[in-house]
């Protein structure tokens, strides 16, 4: 669930 991430969900690994 990467809604706050501007890039792809793959970028949201943090």
Swiss-Prot record:
The modification O-methylthreonine is found at residue 8. There is a cross-link at residues 11-12 (Thiazole-4-carboxylic acid (Cys-Cys)). Disulfide bonds: none annotated. Keywords: Antibiotic, Antimicrobial, Bacteriocin, Hydroxylation, Methylation, Secreted, Thioether bond. It is found in: Secreted. The record marks 8 as: Not methylated. The modification (Z)-2,3-didehydrobutyrine is found at residues 4, 13. One of its GO terms (cellular component) is extracellular region. There is a cross-link at residues 4-5, 8-9 (Thiazole-4-carboxylic acid (Thr-Cys)). Maturation of thiazole and oxazole containing antibiotics involves the enzymatic condensation of a Cys, Ser or Thr with the alpha-carbonyl of the preceding amino acid to form a thioether or ether bond, then dehydration to form a double bond with the alpha-amino nitrogen. Thiazoline or oxazoline ring are dehydrogenated to form thiazole or oxazole rings. Maturation of pyridinyl containing antibiotics involves the cross-linking of a Ser and a Cys-Ser pair usually separated by 7 or 8 residues along the peptide chain. The Ser residues are dehydrated to didehydroalanines, then bonded between their beta carbons. The alpha carbonyl of the Cys condenses with alpha carbon of the first Ser to form a pyridinyl ring. The ring may be multiply dehydrogenated to form a pyridine ring with loss of the amino nitrogen of the first Ser. There is a cross-link at residues 6-7 (Thiazole-4-carboxylic acid (Val-Cys)). Belongs to the thiocillin family. Has bacteriocidal activity against Gram-positive bacteria, but not against Gram-negative bacteria. Inhibits bacterial protein biosynthesis by acting on the elongation factor Tu (EF-Tu). This is Thiocillin. It comes from Bacillus cereus.
